[in-house]
Curated annotation (Swiss-Prot):
Name of this protein: Cell division protein FtsQ
Organism field: Blochmanniella floridana
Family assignment from sequence similarity: Belongs to the FtsQ/DivIB family. FtsQ subfamily.
Keywords from the UniProt entry: Cell cycle, Cell division, Cell inner membrane, Cell membrane, Membrane, Transmembrane, Transmembrane helix
Gene Ontology process terms (BP): cell septum assembly; FtsZ-dependent cytokinesis
Length: 276
């Protein structure tokens, strides 16, 4: 009799333990199901926020919105292919690098690196890394005051198609030499014969010709103080300095910015043609 009671008690305990375990398993399964459903619902929501980082000078918010709309309606965190958007943004000519990634749960993050223009090149721009790129004219109205100021300060380079690197390199060489005497270059121009011409920030034009360019720049720096003295004494302005002579240079003077007068230095006559 005592044995039967112990057996019943044992079976009773086993039954309740099994019931408890079953209940806990059911609750666990229900909880997991609800969590999975919540996660799926959370991730199935559309990407609704866009964060754009990086130093943007040319890229406007309208550009980003247009590209995203062009790529189709934004998907969810799981379904959206960021490579499509990244490829579309990279096609903008002023974009150097772009990174597009998703940030949980509903944000698209875009980081941009644009080419920084060092100068105008013909009707385009040339970057600090020597890459020629263009910018839509309609974007100019969107530029910040900083960018407008930058455009006013960068030089203008002209030259035959395909010679952008050579012109840029010479600009950098000329600029380094003139900077030591507080001159800045507004424009550099060369033609198919590779004759070079500069315009400085004081609007003085330098005609360098096609040979001995560096030597001629140094010569200009040497004689410029004498030209300044004459400008002050006679109230004249320099139109251009012709440095193409084998020795010396000639100066075209302008009185009151109207009448041209020619002046020669170092015994070089006005009509002489002994230059390159």
């Amino acid at each position: 009799m005592q044995y039967i009671l112990k057996l019943k008690y044992y079976l009773y305990n086993i039954t309740w333990k099994l019931v408890f375990i079953c209940v806990m398993l059911v609750l666990l399964i229900v909880g997991i199901h609800k969590n999975i459903k919540w996660v799926c619902d959370y991730y199935s929501g559309p990407l609704s926020y866009i964060i754009v980082t990086g130093n943007r000078f040319f890229t406007t918010n309208d550009d980003i919105n247009y590209i995203i709309l062009k790529s189709g309606v934004l998907g969810t965190f799981i379904t959206q292919d960021v490579n499509i958007i990244q490829k579309q943004i990279k096609q903008m000519p002023w974009i150097q690098k772009v990174s597009v990634r998703k940030q949980w749960p509903n944000t698209l993050k875009i980081n941009l690196i644009e080419y920084i223009p060092i100068a105008y090149w013909n009707n385009e721009f040339i970057s600090t890394t020597g890459v020629v790129f263009s910018v839509s004219e309609c974007l100019y109205n969107e530029y910040s005051s900083f960018v407008r100021k930058m455009y006013q300060e960068i030089p203008i380079l002209y030259g035959p198609t395909g010679k952008d690197q050579e012109v840029l390199n010479n600009y950098l060489r000329f600029s380094a030499i003139l900077k030591s005497s507080n001159f800045q270059i507004k424009s550099v121009k060369t033609d198919t014969c590779y004759t070079w011409q500069l315009v400085l920030d004081n609007n003085v034009c330098l005609k360098l010709g096609c040979v001995n360019l560096i030597e001629r720049l140094h010569y200009f720096i040497k004689v410029y103080p004498f030209l300044v003295k004459e400008m002050d004494e006679k109230n004249k302005y320099i139109d251009y300095v012709d440095l193409r002579y084998n020795s010396g240079c000639s100066v075209r003077w302008i009185h009151n910015m109207i009448d041209p007068v020619f002046h020669a230095i170092n015994n070089v006559s006005k009509g002489s043609h002994d230059y390159d």
